[in-house]
Amino acid sequence: MSRRRRRASATRRSAAVSPPHTPYGSGCISACSWHSTITGHRAQTRLAASSRASRAAVGSFDGAKNRPASSRRQAASECQGPASSSRAGVRWAGTAANGRG
């Protein structure tokens, strides 16, 4: 094959708009269906959907974390208490005074 002919065929191949076709179609459909039967993906999806539906029926679908912005937020001192925060301050002050840290 001459140099000119090789260059023309390479140009034709690389300028293709559509990807090369698989001779017998894609194996994804059978592979995906096989995988879902092995892993139980469809059963898990059905369980999740029914769980969401039951939680939505009681009104807790949004969960406790998604509170409106107008709700009161808890201060850090309410979580830890005054004793734990003062101990931390003393510990850090002590290490700085000893020259360690």
From Swiss-Prot:
Annotated DNA-binding residue span(s): 55-74
What GO molecular function terms would the record report? DNA binding
- In Swiss-Prot or TrEMBL terms, this protein is called Secreted enzymes activator
Composition-biased stretches (Basic residues): 1-10
Source organism of this protein record: Streptomyces griseus
Q: Per UniProt, which keywords does this protein have?
A: Activator, DNA-binding, Transcription, Transcription regulation
Region (Disordered) spans which residues? 1-26, 45-101
Indicate whether Transcription appears among the record's keywords: yes
Q: Which domain of life is it from?
A: Bacteria
- Quote the biased-composition stretches of kind Low complexity, using this chain's numbering: 45-60
| Keyword Zinc-finger assigned | no
- In UniProt terms, what function does this protein have? Increases the production of several extracellular enzymes, like alkaline phosphatase, amylase, protease or lipase. When present in high concentrations, delays the production of pigments and sporulation.
